[in-house]
Amino acid sequence: MQRIKYLLVAGLAMAWGCSSPSSDTASEETMTETSTPTESEWISLFDGETFTGWHKYGGGEVGKAWKIENGELFLDAANKDGWQTGDGGDIVTDQEFENFHFQTEWKIAPNGNSGIIFLVNESEEYDYPWQTGPEMQVLDNDGHPDAKIISHRAGDLYDLIVSNEETVKPVGEWNLAEIIANDGELTLRLNGVDVVKTTMWTPEWEALIADSKFKDMPGFGKYKKGRIALQDHGDIVHFRNIRIKNL
C-alpha cells in the first residue's frame, strides 16, 4: 500500500512538473502576440479593372493610351508625341503619401524606358512629376541607350545613385520594385535585393542633387509628402499588383 501511495504522489508531481512550463509558455506567447504592434494593412492602388485612385498629372482623367487588360495597367505607346505618347502622359495617385512602403511589378518592352516617381508635388508650378519627385528607373538595360549612362539603369535612383547590384530580369519578364521611405531614410529594392540606400534631406542629399541634371530644379527632392507617379516616356510598359503600406 505504501508503495502504491508513493507511486501516486510521484505521478502527480511529475504531471504537475510537466504541465506547468507549458502553461507559462502559452502565457508568454499570448503576451508576445498581444504586445506586438499590428502592422498597417497594405492598400491596393490598382484594382485590376479601373483607374480608380489615379489621374493624369496636372488634372483630368487618365489618358486613353493607358489601358487595362488581364489585371495589368499598361501604356500603349503606338501613338508617339515627342518623347511621350499621344493621349498618354504621366499618371499619379489621387492620394499623397509621406512615410510608406510601395510595391509594384513592372515589365518593360524591348528598348523601353519608364520610371516610378515618388514624393511628387503636383501643382501648376511644375509641368512634370520628375521636377519634384525622385525616380526609380524602369529600363531595358540591354536595349535602351540610357543604360550606357551610370545611374540611368533599371533600379537606379535616377541620375543620383547607381544600384549596388544589378538584379533586373531580362526584358519581357516581371520585376518586383519596392520603394521604402521613412522619415528620410530611403531604400530602393529590386527583386528582393536592396539596391539603393540613402538618406534624403541632408547635406549629402543636396550635394547629390547639385551634381545631377536636377540641379536647376528648385523643387526637386524637397517634398516630404507627395504622390506616386508612373511615367510615360513614350515606350510600352506594364504594371500590376500596385500597392502601398503607410509606415
Residue spans of the language-model regions?
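Carbohydrate-interacting regions of secretory-pathway proteins
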Residues: 18-247
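Sec-dependent signal peptide recognition
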Residues: 2-9
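Bacterial N-terminal signal peptides
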Residues: 9-15
